[in-house]
Amino acid sequence: MPLSYQHFRKLLLLDDEAGPLEEELPRLADEGLNRRVAEDLNLGNLNVSIPWTHKVGNFTGLYSSTVPVFNPEWQTPSFPNIHLQEDIINRCQQYVGPLTVNEKRRLKLIMPARFYPNLTKYLPLDKGIKPYYPEHAVNHYFKTRHYLHTLWQAGILYKRETTRSASFCGSPYSWEQELQHGRLVFQTSTRHGDESFCSQSSGILSRSPVGPCVRSQLKQSRLGLQPQQGSLARGKSGRSGSIRARVHPTTRRSFGVEPSGSGHIDNSASSASSCLHQSAVRKTAYSHLSTSKRQSSSGHAVELHNIPPSSARSQSEGPIFSCWWLQFRNSKPCSDYCLSHIVNLLEDWGPCTEHGEHNIRIPRTPARVTGGVFLVDKNPHNTTESRLVVDFSQFSRGSTHVSWPKFAVPNLQSLTNLLSSNLSWLSLDVSAAFYHIPLHPAAMPHLLVGSSGLPRYVARLSSTSRNINYQHGTMQDLHDSCSRNLYVSLLLLYKTFGRKLHLYSHPIILGFRKIPMGVGLSPFLLAQFTSAICSVVRRAFPHCLAFSYMDDVVLGAKSVQHLESLFTSVTNFLLSLGIHLNPNKTKRWGYSLNFMGYVIGSWGTLPQEHIVLKIKQCFRKLPVNRPIDWKVCQRIVGLLGFAAPFTQCGYPALMPLYACIQSKQAFTFSPTYKAFLCQQYLHLYPVARQRSGLCQVFADATPTGWGLAIGHRRMRGTFVAPLPIHTAELLAACFARSRSGAKLIGTDNSVVLSRKYTSFPWLLGCAANWILRGTSFVYVPSALNPADDPSRGRLGLYRPLLRLPFQPTTGRTSLYAVSPSVPSHLPDRVHFASPLHVAWKPP
């Protein structure tokens, strides 16, 4: 007769009318009983002949691929101009006084962050943008390319210009400025234009047709064409000094950017050298078709314009363009869907490539990528914006994988001890938290993303993919990529991106300048960074609490007025460090804080409402007597495991599921086991914070007997049959709790101390978890344990009762020291930004 749910409850001693604990509990440790119950509940029967179920509610299991959904309306999120202050340590010290060793060490880790992989695999550019959405390939290509461009403009990526140089936007850091090579350097010298151009390889104008043309003018100017020098001098508006524009005249195709030329330029002396203007000209940056502009170290923009297309000779005379897009302009349309129709929509398609404001030298970087990118929804609640997923999983795989640093994540009890209080709470949202932390340029060659350009991408996706040679293709090859699909897609995208279509159709290689999300190093660095900042804030405001986990920062204060003034001063402090907060997402929680999926109040901690709802839905959909694929079980256990500490029996109740996942077998829920779990999760009990106190109750056991010391009373008992020592110690602790009701129990057994009861016989683990819920344990060495003698059957000998103090732990969670009082170098009255004295009047 199968075990009914009522009977099972009684067996687990979850009902009040159970017999004396000393008799009932040891039975649950019996292997025979555990085996019989497992058979009754169908827990052990793992090899089943019925086909497995692969979907339960929203949980999918084996052999199911979740197809990501492409949204053609995705918006690219905007990124603020994030620049974390380089002297962050000094700024913190001005704010709070000398930093602790821990804080300094953590802040030095991220200024700048460094990345040392064991081995880097380079992938061809075709793999830069993953063909994740074959139906929307072109649309996805441009949206991703636009996202990358946005990141580059926000100073989050470097753009590879040549093998050894890169450009970026935003404010440079000192470790980026040291790399002077590759700038346009203005040197003041008395000789006037003698070495007007020094041609050194720098990669600023590499591969552009301007190179040879400028050279030819130099020869002319050396031959004494004076008017030329005059114009140069005027171009500098009278500054004496020779201009060094390091021009790289190579014809070798070092990949990275396609030439920015707009066709062949003859050696007319009018084009380049008279175009060296002051930075005022920057406004007309793209007035000509191709402009390569550079910010030089003295702040002048040096621009080399090619002649505008209007005066360019007809294409038939000159050589073929190397720009795939612009070649369509002069070719005959091959059909109604020829791309030349789109290219002829605009006269001026803008530059072929854009260059950043700053140029730096980088270690040798090949024209390859090290990870692919694709777009997904920003999060389940926000499907209008996209998020870029970067796959750098190569660094976590194989024998050469990087072992990422481990860091402490606060566990539930530590979190409760720390945050369960009667404070008012608010949480701050750090916008684009990962992109705050700068990476050293030496990491760039390992973290490359990019794309091979539209023609290669389209050719790779089309079934008739020929190996087209783009260097010297014929017009026929050019039209190979024309198709109705491409035409329609580009026409729609033209509405969104306009002339940017041209820029985005070129190949590009980008390296990360700030830490990317797809690398195991990033969460570690972010956790170090925010915990150090919170540590500083806690010391600046000793009467308040600041705590963070990754990019989630919470502030707590005694009253709402305190909290508001704390909020103002902390926000200003964070902004002064260059940390960007998202003011729209600041949440005020009142007295119950929502953090890391929990609700934490003065009464303790519970899971958030949306998780409780998910669990209810999960049980509603859970089939009975049908084998469920272990992958689905994994997902179910993930959800239930999060809320397990809030149930009567805790994790031990899920042990049968864990066992089936480990053996990769299907699991069949019997009606009784499902009803048992259902009841467990219907009534959730808060996890309360531990209180400090003196331990007065001690438990000890031998394999044959148990002993307790409760105050000055001593008790002992024997087991019917000898038990494993850990089991005996656990039973003794349960007896101590039920006899004395004490929340603090001294024990000398490390397994009992750890409060992980998953390795005990299943029924005993479940029952013990309920009996010992909310109990704190103190370690007492065996030699000093007052319960040691009674457990050996000696009641007459009294060891003196220990005074064992118990301090609740906050684990290794980034709280270094108890916050000291405000450092002494501040004025004695009160810190200017302190909300401590709301009604403070000057003396």
Swiss-Prot record:
Chain positions covered by the region annotation Spacer: 178-346
Compositionally biased region (Polar residues): 290-299
Activity regulation info: Activated by host HSP70 and HSP40 in vitro to be able to bind the epsilon loop of the pgRNA. Because deletion of the RNase H region renders the protein partly chaperone-independent, the chaperones may be needed indirectly to relieve occlusion of the RNA-binding site by this domain. Inhibited by several reverse-transcriptase inhibitors: Lamivudine, Adefovir and Entecavir.
UniProt catalytic activity: DNA(n) + a 2'-deoxyribonucleoside 5'-triphosphate = DNA(n+1) + diphosphate; Endonucleolytic cleavage to 5'-phosphomonoester
Keywords (A to Z) from UniProt: DNA replication, DNA-binding, DNA-directed DNA polymerase, Endonuclease, Host-virus interaction, Hydrolase, Inhibition of host innate immune response by virus, Inhibition of host RLR pathway by virus, Magnesium, Metal-binding, Multifunctional enzyme, Nuclease, Nucleotidyltransferase, RNA-directed DNA polymerase, Transferase, Viral immunoevasion
EC number from the UniProt entry: 2.7.7.7, 2.7.7.49, 3.1.26.4
Example of a GO biological process term: DNA replication
Family matches, as SUPFAM superfamilies: DNA/RNA polymerases
Residue ranges occupied by any Reverse transcriptase domain in the UniProt entry: 357-600
Annotated region described as Polymerase/reverse transcriptase domain (RT), given as residue ranges: 347-690
Region ranges (Terminal protein domain (TP)): 1-177
Pfam families: DNA_pol_viral_C, DNA_pol_viral_N, RVT_1
InterPro entries, A to Z: DNA/RNA_pol_sf (IPR043502), DNApol_viral_C (IPR001462), DNApol_viral_N (IPR000201), HBV_DPOL (IPR037531), Rev_trsase/Diguanyl_cyclase (IPR043128), RT_dom (IPR000477), Viral_Replic_Matur_Polypro (IPR051320)
PANTHER family: PEPTIDASE A2 DOMAIN-CONTAINING PROTEIN-RELATED (PTHR33064:SF29), POL PROTEIN (PTHR33064)
Role according to the record: Multifunctional enzyme that converts the viral RNA genome into dsDNA in viral cytoplasmic capsids. This enzyme displays a DNA polymerase activity that can copy either DNA or RNA templates, and a ribonuclease H (RNase H) activity that cleaves the RNA strand of RNA-DNA heteroduplexes in a partially processive 3'- to 5'-endonucleasic mode. Neo-synthesized pregenomic RNA (pgRNA) are encapsidated together with the P protein, and reverse-transcribed inside the nucleocapsid.
Further facts: Hepadnaviral virions contain probably just one P protein molecule per particle.
Designated name of the protein: Protein P
Organism encoding this protein: Hepatitis B virus genotype C subtype ar (isolate Japan/S-207/1988)
Native organism taxonomy: Viruses, Riboviria, Pararnavirae, Artverviricota, Revtraviricetes
